[in-house]
Amino acid sequence: MATEQMFCFQCEQVAKCEACTGGAGVCGKPADVAEAQDALTGAMIALARTAREAGVKNDRICDLIVDGLFTCMTNVNFDGQAVTALKDAVRVETVAVAAAAGIEPVSDYDVDQIWGDDEDIRSLKSLVLFGLRGTAAYADHARVLGYRDATVDEFFADALAQLAEPGSVDALLPLALKVGEVNLGCMRLLDEANTGTYGTPEPTTVAMEVEPGPFIVISGHDLHDLKLLLEQTEGTGVSIYTHGEMLPAHAYPELKKYPQLKGNFGTAWQNQKKEFDGVPAAFLFTTNCLMPPKESYADNVFTTEVVAFPGCTHIGPDKDFGPVIQKALELGGYDEPHTIPGINGGTTMTTGFAQGTVLSVADTVVDAVKSGAIKHFFLVAGCDGARPGRNYYTDFVKATPDDTVVLTLACGKYRFNDLDLGEIGGLPRLMDMGQCNDAYSAIQVAVALAEAFDCGVNDLPLSMVLSWYEQKAVCILLTLLYLGIRNIKLGPTLPAFVSPGVLDVLVENYGIAPITTPEADLAELLGE
């Protein structure tokens, strides 16, 4: 639907669980930035259609589309001028591709045609578009490490081009599942990139105490930026603390070897305005999730890659983090040790239980299941957010029986990752598998267990209780649906962009259901 201001319903905390349509979104994105992102999306669709007509596929086209899709994710880019500049670059490429092929460039697509379409068509096209945005983030992280996959790269343009076509439920549902299939390949690629570059993650206990002295807090998902920052801070006396989804970096051998990588600062992304206020440190955002900074610390915030906020210093492609380091030295850090405990009062967290670690003890896990020591596995994973009701995930994990194992990943784990759930046969009951893209690890572990027990994944004593917030959660959900995973519990609310008709299909074919209460859901999942 066309609006005089913005229309955006891609994240979990949209206004009234419907859409953000006023002068700014709940995320803080102004209407002019939302409109610029729609214009950028329309320009990318035009580039995709022009390239298809010209029969052209190359890295330049893919890179522009990946950057554009990533830019439009929630809590990434709040700078309308930067978004418009990228749109202009996309248009220049569209004209160049057309000229080289001797054809007319396709006009920029008006995405209001999607927002105003039949609700089921709009729903499925939104699933595709938002899923592509999530997958693009993973493709970007792999790309900066030198890993690419032609199948993944070419799919972005192909899928975008299809969004401009009239479409039908019968055609768009398979396209949405194709996004899930391609995202699986992209997560596999990123897993290879991360482990090939930084080693196999290993169980690591991470402190939540900040030592005296100057320090930098690095947030986001980009391990490459962290590695560069660690290299540039050697010998400076500046310590590095991870934040949010950067926590799993502590488990990678090639990153944890740096002595200045000290610990983790704070809790999940949505608490940053409170936790960053008055902190004598520099903050570097490498990806989402950036919130509009408070004036009290805005001068200490730096962005890089596609992340941007007006007035905050942006570190360009040269990756010279000198200004960030200098700011940390100027601020000086704390005079005494300072601790920000987890939401349950814990002061340490453990990470590093990716597939390499879990599969290395697969025999022990299988034996524990066969002996009855482990009765059930729960994957409690996904995004955190500010909407009331997310304490459900804390209460759910606290209530899991002692003979069950909780696997987790992504930032939703901050609801409970400072808890000590004890052990089963030497194995911790709570295992953090990593970032959201490490859903690939969870999938591989599930597949390995299914093979060990000669059954399907849906037949395992395994339940998935997921939380979502932004578009990477969308592409992961599509991957799980592509794999045929059933009976997923999803919360804290269902996506506003999923129409009743599409929801009926997902419920009928995949058994997706909203979370209710921890007690009721636990009883159902355990068959009690």
Can you name each region flagged by the protein language model?
Residues A2-V33, Q37-D38, I45, V56, ...:
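Anaerobic metallocofactor- and corrinoid-dependent redox/one-carbon enzyme cores
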Residues M44-T197:
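Electropositive, gly/pro-rich neighborhoods at or near active sites that engage anionic ligands
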